[in-house]
A protein has these predicted regions:
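Hydrophobic alpha-helical segments with transmembrane-like composition
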Residues: 29, 69-129, 277-278
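Membrane-interface helix-loop-helix regions
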Residues: 29-90, 197-205
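Small-polar-interrupted transmembrane alpha-helices in polytopic inner-membrane proteins
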Residues: 36, 114-134, 172-179
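Final/C-terminal transmembrane alpha-helix of multipass membrane proteins
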Residues: 291-307
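Alpha-helical transmembrane segments in multi-pass integral membrane proteins
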Residues: 3-20, 102-106, 135-290, 307
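Membrane-interfacial loop-to-helix junctions in multi-pass inner-membrane proteins
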Residues: 13-34, 51-58, 109-118, 286-292
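Hydrophobic alpha-helical transmembrane segments
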Residues: 30, 117-121, 260-268
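Hydrophobic alpha-helical transmembrane segments of multipass membrane transporters and ion channels
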Residues: 31-39, 93, 232-236, 290
């Protein structure tokens, strides 16, 4: 949804330098990701004696660190250094695939009359193929094609929400619902059902302008703030969890109240760490120098724990 808003809000690619945009996306994704992985590698080394190998990732190899930095860890079958890092790699693949699909008609120099609809048609075709075929093949779950069904629904929902004619909007929503229902009839998948319902709700919300912050109640402000740091929170919560669990384990036998306090502390510390990660890394402009510096920090952390 958001990728469509930045790449082709009107169905025509608005990016002059696609490869530069791909690197920009890579930088935005990996800067906080590399910083969080560096913290995780160091925290895991401290927590390992208290929690054991089953809970804590093993000491990383150089190849494993390089693969994670290049977002190739799953494709190269390396064990993850933290929870959820597969999502970052898939998000980057999905963005690159979306950019390729939206930009292909321009490369092929389609006639002006077809230039607006060709990208939408390509996204629709690949999304349907993903829903009906690719998403049902477990061996493809390390690639963007496996997830593009849900991603494509979000892209299509954005374009549907911008339809000016009521009849066009209703027809597009009906087609979107029909495609999703057909995919679920072929093979029920709860995640696809959630993606379909979410896409339809977003299309309605965009149509009624509910997505504008001006229409949100004051009580939603804290949620907006949490949403702003949500990516950093997603990345940093695991090393915080490891650190708190190691501390609790080091206390020896304890009761449920200690576990409860540990959970509360984990949440509070995770939010605090996410704020620091967001302000110190994620909110800063992506640059080659910053990416290389953070990549080097990850490699150095691996060397530190290996000796």
């Amino acid at each position: 949804f958001l990728a469509t808003a930045s790449l082709a809000p009107d169905g025509v690619l608005r990016v002059d330098r696609p490869f530069s945009r791909i690197f920009q996306r890579y930088g935005r994704l990996v800067m906080p990701y590399l910083a969080a992985l560096t913290v995780c590698v160091l925290v895991a080394e401290v927590a390992r004696p208290w929690l054991g190998e089953e809970v804590v990732p093993a000491e990383p190899s150089l190849g494993q660190l390089l693969a994670h930095g290049l977002l190739l860890q799953d494709l190269l079958n390396y064990e993850s250094l933290s929870t959820g890092v597969w999502y970052v790699a898939i998000d980057f693949q999905l963005f690159a695939l979306a950019l390729a699909l939206v930009g292909l008609p321009a490369v092929l120099r389609q006639p002006t009359s077809a230039a607006r609809w060709a990208p939408v048609a390509l996204v629709f075709i690949v999304a349907v193929a993903s829903l009906a075929l690719f998403n049902r093949q477990a061996r493809l779950d390390e690639t963007a094609f496996y997830f593009f069904g849900a991603y494509g629904l979000g892209m299509l929902a954005f374009w549907v929400g911008r339809a000016t004619r009521t009849s066009t909007w209703c027809s597009a929503v009906a087609l979107l619902a029909l495609v999703g229902a057909g995919a679920l009839a072929i093979d029920w998948r709860s995640r696809i059902a959630i993606a379909l319902v979410t896409a339809l709700l977003i299309a309605v919300a965009q149509r009624r302008q509910w997505l504008s912050p001006a229409h949100w109640p004051a009580a939603a402000v804290p949620l907006q703030q949490l949403g702003r740091i949500s990516y950093s929170l997603f990345l940093i919560h695991f090393p915080v969890l490891l650190a708190v669990n190691a501390l609790v384990a080091g206390l020896g036998p304890h009761g449920p109240w200690v576990d409860l306090l540990g959970m509360i502390a984990t949440f509070g510390l995770s939010v605090g760490a996410a704020v620091l990660l967001y302000r110190g890394v994620e909110a800063r402009p992506a640059s080659l120098r910053s990416v290389c510096t953070l990549f080097a920090a990850l490699l150095v952390s691996g060397l530190i724990v290996s000796y």
